[in-house]
Amino acid sequence: GDYADGWSETPEVLDFLIEYQKKQRCLFLRGNHDALCREFLLGKEMDTLWRLHGGKATEKAYRNVSAERKKAHIDFINSLENYYLDSKNRLFLHAGFTNLRGIAHEHFEQMYYWDRTLWELACSVSLPKTDKYYPNRLKLYNEIYIGHTPTTRLGTDKPLIINGVANVDTGAGFKGRLTVMDIETKQYWQSEPVYKLY
């Protein structure tokens, strides 16, 4: 998630993803910035906070984009998945979930792309997984893969795996790196700090 609002090329990124999925089987997850970009493209009045967190660059990038192209981008954003649960009980989502019984019971779909409490919980728990007080949310899935909350907040630009939650957001939306991870081996690759690419 968060294909939008990061830097100055949101329309080009969305065009690339739309074309790429025609050549390669893809599963795209919804991020909070994608949801916000959709609102902007639909004409909603956006607030200052959005503009300060990448929205200003998105507004500028869309100034000369045709209505037809904007519609294609809205359709693409509408097609994004909130989460993916694979056959090995590994959960992939942008941010987290809050329901103690898991994703199937989440009452507010926005939590999949706005929640930070899952990562905060994973970072704060020191109990062994076998302890009866170990948080249920961290026991439901074999592995959980998220982004949304940069690992740079914990002083590193590397992905972190804590209590079964792998966070691969290494701050690309700010001055960090873009990271991809092989979920089988946990090997990862990173870009240069993204701001150096512009």
Predicted regions mapped to residue ranges:
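Catalytic phosphate/metal-binding cores of nucleic-acid and nucleotide-processing enzymes, i.e., regions
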Residues: 49, 65, 99-102, 134-137, ...
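Conserved beta-sheet core of the metallophosphoesterase superfamily
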Residues: 128-194
